[in-house]
Each structure stands twice: as structure tokens, then as C-alpha cells.
Amino acid sequence: TFGKNGVVLWRCANGLENSPVCNMGYRPPVKSVGRGVTCVDDLRDNDEVWRVLLSLSHAVSKHLREDGLLAGGVQIGIKNTALFTSQSQSKLIYPTQNSREIALKAFSLFKQTYKWQTPVRAVTVRAIELLNPDKPQQLSLGFDMTRHEKLERLDKAMLRINEKYGKGTVVEATVLNGTKMPTTVPSADKDISFLP
């Protein structure tokens, strides 16, 4: 069955769909921002997965900044060599656009859920529960706002340098060790996601 989309499809097919026509140039609100990649070689340990998650998180962070949104949570998708796909998600303590915070949450989810019975073939990172940065945020006890602001300044500086001098001019040292990602990584204007 198609669930609630089945009703919409049936109504459209039978000429009963009566929602108003959208204005030209209308863009529906963004619900999530994600990047994913099928690696050129299987990922066999946590260090290799961390480097891929960090690279993907930089792309997600860039897209969040372009759209002026904050991530309220992170979702990961993992496909192993048996082509089994699993997804997990978690809320962030404080909404962010920061690539390191997104990557750390994604890696935490990965370590909690993946048991290494088979190597990893593909990885997806998605920012979910998107928020407007102008909306007031509830501070949380135990959240290090000073560290958050420092990481935010670092992320913005890296982004400015990469925009001025070209992608990959400044990267985190961890990524220099190799990511097993294709040399042509999905660009920031293409969303890739796993289908259920």
C-alpha cells in the first residue's frame, strides 16, 4: 500500500484533487538536508567511517548555511556490503549548522547502532528537524556554549577560505588520511537519500 500518499495518488488519478495551484517560483519549505555517498572501497573500521561522516557533514553544514537553517537533529543511513540499509536518528542538545557537531552526533549514532558484522558500503548524513535561526532557542544545562561558538567561528572561516580559493583548500587533517570517497563527491546542490 502507499499509505497516505495512496489517497493523494488516487484523488489525482480520478480527477478529484482540488488543492490550489502554487505560484510560479514557489519552493516548498525544506524539511531535511542530507548528503550521502557510496564509497569506492568498503569501510572496515570506525576511523574510515568517521572521515566519511566528517566530509559529508561539511557538505550538509554548507547547505544549511545557504538555506539559513539550523539542524535540530541528525539522521544517518548505513548500507553494508550485503546491501542491508539501516537508519537511526537523534536530536541535538542545541540546534546547529556546525559540521563538527553534526559529524560527532552522526558518529555517536553509528557507534551505537552498527555492530561491524560486515563492512560498510554507503553512508548518508541528514540534518532533520530544521529550525529558523531567528527563533529563540532553549539553552540546556551541560551544553558548552563557548565551545559551540568557537567551532562555529572555525567552520565559518573554513567555509569562507574554501569559497574564495576553491573547494578543499582548507580541510580537517583527519580527512587528509583518505576517505574512500569518489573523487567527484556529490555537489552541494544535489540531495541524495536512501529509499525505505
Model feature map: region roles:
Residues 92-196:
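Acidic, metal-coordinating catalytic segment for phosphate/diphosphate chemistry
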Residues 1-119, 195:
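DNA-contacting surface of Y-family translesion DNA polymerases
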